[in-house]
Amino acid sequence: MFTDHARIYVKAGDGGAGALSFRREKYVPRGGPDGGNGGHGGNVLLEVSEQLNTLQDYRYKHHFVAPNGGRGGGSRRHGKDGEDLVLKVPPGSVVKGEDGTTLADLIVSRQQVQVAKAGRGGRGNASFKSATRQTPRFAELGEPGESRWISLELKLIADV
C-alpha cells in the first residue's frame, strides 16, 4: 500500500548526569573532587534516501527515541555520548511541526535536517572546583532532550 502521509513522535536523548566523586588513594587521605561530566544525548535527524519512495516505514511505528548520554564517572571520566538517531525518508518529503509550519523540504539525496536537539550532559563536581570552593559536594544533572510530534508529507510528482 502506498503511504504519502505520516505523523510521528521524536525525542532526542537526555544528557547524562555528572558524577559526584572524590579521589581516594592509600596515602592521599583527603583527595580533591574528581567527578567526570555526563555525556550528551543523541540528536534525531531525518535523511533523504533514494532507495525509498513511500513513507511506509512510519505507518505502524510512530515513536522514535534517540539514546541518552552516559553518566560521568570517578577519576574525571566523561560519560559516553548518545548516538544520533537517523530516520530515512524519500526525496520530496516535507516536514511540518505540530502547528503546521514547514520545518524542512527534503529534496536532495543524503540531505539531513535535525528535528530534535539532544540534551547537554551535566557537569561533575571536578568542574565546580575553585580556589575558594575546593571540595564541591554537588554535581549537575543532564538536560532533557527535545521532544515533538512532526508530520511527514510526500510530494508526488506525476510522470507524464
Question: Which stretches of residues belong to each language-model region?
Answer:
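Conserved P-loop NTPase architecture
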Residues: 1-160
